[in-house]
Amino acid sequence: MKAVVDAAGRIVVPKPLREALGLQPGSTVEISRYGAGLHLIPTGRTARLEEENGVLVATGETTIDDEVVFGLIDSGRK
């Protein structure tokens, strides 16, 4: 997908990517240089490991449903 950098240096993240990553107005992201490109990672998501019945299980407050998972899979295929 292509995006344009405006005069103020802003980039609009295309809607399919925002939806796939769960980005909403006010979401924060970590942005860094990655080779000849940029690496953009949503922040503020928490996950931790807790023991349940002797097994470590990832828990957190971020909800992920099938739509988010399929969106991530589809965005990785394009």
UniProtKB/Swiss-Prot annotation:
One of its GO terms (molecular function) is DNA binding. This is Antitoxin VapB27. InterPro entries: SpoVT-AbrB_dom, SpoVT-AbrB_sf. Belongs to the VapB family. Gene3D superfamilies: 2.10.260.10. Antitoxin component of a type II toxin-antitoxin (TA) system. Cognate toxin is VapC27. Upon expression in E.coli partially counteracts the ribonuclease activity of non-cognate toxins MazF6 and MazF9. It comes from the Bacteria. The gene is vapB27. Residues 1-45 form the SpoVT-AbrB domain. Interacts with cognate toxin VapC27 and non-cognate toxins MazF6 and VapC40. Interaction with MazF6 and MazF9 partially neutralizes the toxins. It holds the Pfam family MazE_antitoxin. Keywords: DNA-binding, Toxin-antitoxin system.
